[in-house]
Amino acid sequence: MRYVLCVKQPAYGKQGGFLAYQLAKALLEKGHQITQVFFFQEGVTHGNAFLYPASDEFNLQHAWQRLAQDYHVPLHLCVAAAQRRGVVEPLTSSTTQQNNLASCFVLAGLGEFMKASLEADRVVCL
């Protein structure tokens, strides 16, 4: 089956982001396809390159990046939510010098999320 996941929970402070990662990993290991993970609202914090968890904590951002690389899963951050929360790339910042978008994450609009959702068999929001 083809899945789209949408993540509304922040990278740290709540359990939803980690639960979304666990679900994604389990789906992929069972042979399902994830056509997009869309991070919006507080979920865009997953794509902030300036996240520095303690050395004894699970690094959720690195886990998403490994998942994206290993399974070719697109990690999309809502561009509007990201800008409101200070996550920018050179094209969306006030100057071309600013960039704190983590690798493997891209900024995308709701239209891309809706298109992926319409083409998916299941959409799961956490």
From Swiss-Prot:
Record's subcellular location: Cytoplasm
Gene3D superfamilies for the chain: DsrEFH-like (3.40.1260.10)
Primary location recorded for the protein, binned into one broad class: cytoplasm
GO biological process, alphabetically ordered: tRNA wobble position uridine thiolation
Transmembrane regions listed in the UniProt entry: none
Positions of the catalytic residues: 78 (cysteine persulfide intermediate)
Superkingdom of this protein's organism: Bacteria
GO molecular function: sulfur carrier activity; sulfurtransferase activity
Pfam families xref list: DsrE
GO cellular component, one term: sulfurtransferase complex
Keywords: Cytoplasm, Transferase
Enzyme kind, highest EC tier: transferase
EC number: 2.8.1.-
NCBIfam families: PRK00207.1, sulf_tusD_dsrE
PANTHER family in alphabetical order: PROTEIN YCHN (PTHR34874), SULFURTRANSFERASE TUSD (PTHR34874:SF3)
General function of this protein: Could be part of a sulfur-relay system.
Family named by the database record: Belongs to the DsrE/TusD family.
Full protein name: Sulfurtransferase TusD homolog
Native source species: Pasteurella multocida (strain Pm70)
Taxonomic lineage from the root: Bacteria, Pseudomonadati, Pseudomonadota, Gammaproteobacteria, Pasteurellales
